[in-house]
Amino acid sequence: MGLSDQEWQHVLTIWGKVESDLAGHGHQVLMRLFQDHPETLDRFEKFKGLKTPDQMKGSEDLKKHGVTVLTQLGKILKQKGNHESELKPLAQTHATKHKIPVKYLEFISEAIIKVIAEKHASSFGADSQAAMKKALELFRNDMASKYKEFGFQG
Protein backbone atom coordinates (compact mmCIF):
# COMPACT_ATOMS: atom_id res chain seq x y z
CA MET A 1 0.00 0.00 0.00
CA GLY A 2 3.02 2.23 -0.30
CA LEU A 3 3.06 5.36 -2.40
CA SER A 4 5.06 5.82 -5.58
CA ASP A 5 7.76 8.48 -5.81
CA GLN A 6 5.37 10.60 -7.86
CA GLU A 7 2.63 10.27 -5.24
CA TRP A 8 5.04 11.29 -2.47
CA GLN A 9 6.04 14.27 -4.61
CA HIS A 10 2.39 15.35 -4.80
CA VAL A 11 2.03 14.95 -1.02
CA LEU A 12 5.17 16.89 -0.17
CA THR A 13 4.49 19.65 -2.69
CA ILE A 14 1.07 20.41 -1.22
CA TRP A 15 2.43 19.95 2.30
CA GLY A 16 4.88 22.77 1.58
CA LYS A 17 1.86 25.03 1.09
CA VAL A 18 0.37 23.81 4.38
CA GLU A 19 3.64 24.56 6.18
CA SER A 20 3.61 28.13 4.90
CA ASP A 21 0.77 28.75 7.39
CA LEU A 22 0.71 25.93 9.94
CA ALA A 23 -1.27 28.00 12.45
CA GLY A 24 -4.00 28.88 9.96
CA HIS A 25 -4.26 25.40 8.50
CA GLY A 26 -4.07 23.66 11.88
CA HIS A 27 -6.69 25.92 13.43
CA GLN A 28 -9.06 25.32 10.50
CA VAL A 29 -8.47 21.56 10.56
CA LEU A 30 -9.37 21.30 14.24
CA MET A 31 -12.36 23.61 13.84
CA ARG A 32 -13.59 21.46 10.94
CA LEU A 33 -13.01 18.27 12.96
CA PHE A 34 -14.97 19.55 15.97
CA GLN A 35 -17.78 21.02 13.87
CA ASP A 36 -18.21 17.95 11.65
CA HIS A 37 -17.70 15.47 14.51
CA PRO A 38 -18.58 17.15 17.83
CA GLU A 39 -18.08 13.85 19.66
CA THR A 40 -14.33 14.26 19.13
CA LEU A 41 -14.34 17.21 21.54
CA ASP A 42 -14.81 14.72 24.39
CA ARG A 43 -11.17 13.66 24.00
CA PHE A 44 -9.88 17.22 24.52
CA GLU A 45 -10.46 18.37 28.08
CA LYS A 46 -9.23 21.91 27.45
CA PHE A 47 -11.45 22.38 24.38
CA LYS A 48 -14.74 21.02 25.78
CA GLY A 49 -16.04 24.54 26.44
CA LEU A 50 -15.68 25.53 22.78
CA LYS A 51 -19.22 25.07 21.50
CA THR A 52 -19.55 27.70 18.77
CA PRO A 53 -17.47 28.52 15.69
CA ASP A 54 -16.74 31.97 17.17
CA GLN A 55 -15.41 30.42 20.39
CA MET A 56 -13.22 28.10 18.32
CA LYS A 57 -11.97 30.94 16.12
CA GLY A 58 -10.96 32.94 19.18
CA SER A 59 -9.12 30.11 20.93
CA GLU A 60 -5.35 30.53 21.00
CA ASP A 61 -5.05 27.07 22.61
CA LEU A 62 -6.88 25.52 19.67
CA LYS A 63 -4.59 27.33 17.24
CA LYS A 64 -1.49 26.13 19.14
CA HIS A 65 -2.73 22.56 19.16
CA GLY A 66 -3.40 22.77 15.43
CA VAL A 67 0.25 23.72 14.90
CA THR A 68 1.33 20.76 17.04
CA VAL A 69 -0.87 18.32 15.12
CA LEU A 70 0.27 19.45 11.67
CA THR A 71 3.93 19.73 12.71
CA GLN A 72 3.90 16.10 13.87
CA LEU A 73 2.04 14.95 10.77
CA GLY A 74 4.50 16.84 8.57
CA LYS A 75 7.45 15.06 10.20
CA ILE A 76 5.75 11.74 9.50
CA LEU A 77 4.83 12.56 5.89
CA LYS A 78 8.38 13.70 5.10
CA GLN A 79 9.63 10.21 5.96
CA LYS A 80 7.73 8.86 2.93
CA GLY A 81 6.44 5.81 4.77
CA ASN A 82 9.66 5.12 6.71
CA HIS A 83 8.18 6.76 9.78
CA GLU A 84 8.59 4.18 12.56
CA SER A 85 10.69 6.44 14.80
CA GLU A 86 8.26 9.38 14.45
CA LEU A 87 5.10 7.28 14.61
CA LYS A 88 5.84 5.10 17.63
CA PRO A 89 5.85 7.82 20.34
CA LEU A 90 2.80 9.47 18.76
CA ALA A 91 0.91 6.17 18.68
CA GLN A 92 1.92 5.43 22.26
CA THR A 93 0.54 8.70 23.65
CA HIS A 94 -2.59 8.51 21.52
CA ALA A 95 -3.22 4.88 22.57
CA THR A 96 -2.26 4.92 26.24
CA LYS A 97 -2.77 8.50 27.41
CA HIS A 98 -5.29 10.21 25.13
CA LYS A 99 -7.14 7.05 23.99
CA ILE A 100 -7.91 8.48 20.54
CA PRO A 101 -9.91 5.95 18.46
CA VAL A 102 -8.66 5.16 14.96
CA LYS A 103 -12.04 6.40 13.69
CA TYR A 104 -11.09 9.88 14.93
CA LEU A 105 -7.90 9.68 12.86
CA GLU A 106 -10.15 9.08 9.85
CA PHE A 107 -12.20 12.13 10.82
CA ILE A 108 -9.15 14.38 11.10
CA SER A 109 -7.81 13.02 7.81
CA GLU A 110 -11.08 14.06 6.15
CA ALA A 111 -10.79 17.50 7.75
CA ILE A 112 -7.21 17.88 6.49
CA ILE A 113 -8.25 17.00 2.92
CA LYS A 114 -11.19 19.44 3.04
CA VAL A 115 -9.13 22.32 4.43
CA ILE A 116 -6.33 21.84 1.89
CA ALA A 117 -8.90 21.63 -0.93
CA GLU A 118 -10.54 24.87 0.24
CA LYS A 119 -7.30 26.80 0.73
CA HIS A 120 -5.37 25.46 -2.28
CA ALA A 121 -7.97 24.43 -4.86
CA SER A 122 -5.77 25.22 -7.86
CA SER A 123 -2.81 23.22 -6.48
CA PHE A 124 -4.74 20.30 -5.02
CA GLY A 125 -6.16 18.50 -8.03
CA ALA A 126 -7.34 14.92 -8.31
CA ASP A 127 -3.84 13.38 -8.37
CA SER A 128 -2.68 15.36 -5.34
CA GLN A 129 -5.87 14.61 -3.44
CA ALA A 130 -5.60 10.90 -4.20
CA ALA A 131 -1.95 10.86 -3.10
CA MET A 132 -2.71 12.72 0.14
CA LYS A 133 -5.62 10.39 0.91
CA LYS A 134 -3.33 7.42 0.35
CA ALA A 135 -0.59 8.89 2.57
CA LEU A 136 -3.08 9.61 5.36
CA GLU A 137 -4.49 6.09 5.04
CA LEU A 138 -0.97 4.68 5.39
CA PHE A 139 -0.50 6.83 8.51
CA ARG A 140 -3.82 5.63 10.01
CA ASN A 141 -3.13 1.98 9.25
CA ASP A 142 0.31 2.20 10.84
CA MET A 143 -1.14 4.03 13.87
CA ALA A 144 -3.76 1.26 14.23
CA SER A 145 -1.03 -1.40 14.13
CA LYS A 146 0.95 0.44 16.80
CA TYR A 147 -2.19 0.86 18.91
CA LYS A 148 -2.52 -2.94 19.01
CA GLU A 149 1.10 -3.26 20.13
CA PHE A 150 0.24 -0.96 23.03
CA GLY A 151 -2.86 -3.00 23.89
CA PHE A 152 -5.35 -0.39 22.66
CA GLN A 153 -7.96 -1.59 20.18
CA GLY A 154 -8.97 1.97 19.31
Swiss-Prot record:
The entry's keywords: Cytoplasm, Heme, Iron, Metal-binding, Muscle protein, Oxidoreductase, Oxygen transport, Transport
Gene Ontology molecular function: any one: metal ion binding
Annotated Gene Ontology cellular component terms: extracellular exosome; sarcoplasm
Any Gene Ontology biological process: removal of superoxide radicals
EC top class, as a word: oxidoreductase
Family affiliation: Belongs to the globin family.
Protein name: Myoglobin
Gene it is expressed from: MB
